[in-house]
Amino acid sequence: MTGVVVEDGRILLLNQDTDAGRSWSLPGGKLEAGETLAQALVREMKEETGLDVLPGRLLYVCDHVPAEVVHMTFEARRTGGTLGDVMAGADTTPIRGVDFVPVAKLPELGFSQRFAELVTAGFPGAGSYMGPKSAIGL
């Protein structure tokens, strides 16, 4: 699952290598035993970004066939914490930094134009099944 935090036209991203060939990604991860989706999102966001968040609406559910997982994207709102206070070993891929990046720069950072458009439009169709993860440009 991933969390999307947008503030003043800027989106929260991790600077880390990804399997998509870009060096920026959305924060998120996997559920641990006994966790709800909301608990997992709160934990992953804190570990990877240093921020406390309040989980919001489900944005999209997608298939991520190569990894044999269902990918869920949630909206989240910052409620506290310290940006960049990343927990050591928070991810299997080292996190080099955390930043709020202008949404308009998403394509320059390797995200698809489709994803940038969805963010800008406020995620039309939120809460729906979108098919493959590529359908939302991730």
What annotation goes with each model-predicted range?
Residues D63-D85, D99-V103, L118-G122:
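Active-site-adjacent beta-strand/loop module that shapes the phosphate/pyrophosphate-binding cleft
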Residues D19-R22, E68:
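A conserved beta-turn-beta hairpin within the catalytic core of GNAT-like acetyltransferases
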Residues L26-L58, F74:
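The catalytic Nudix box helix
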Residues V6, L26, V53, A67-H71, ...:
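Short connector loops at helix/strand junctions that flank enzyme active sites
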Residues M1-I11, K30:
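Conserved N-terminal beta-strand and adjoining loop/helix that marks the start
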Residues G56, V86-T92:
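Vicinal oxygen chelate
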Residues G21-W24, D91-L138:
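Nudix hydrolase/Nudix homology domain
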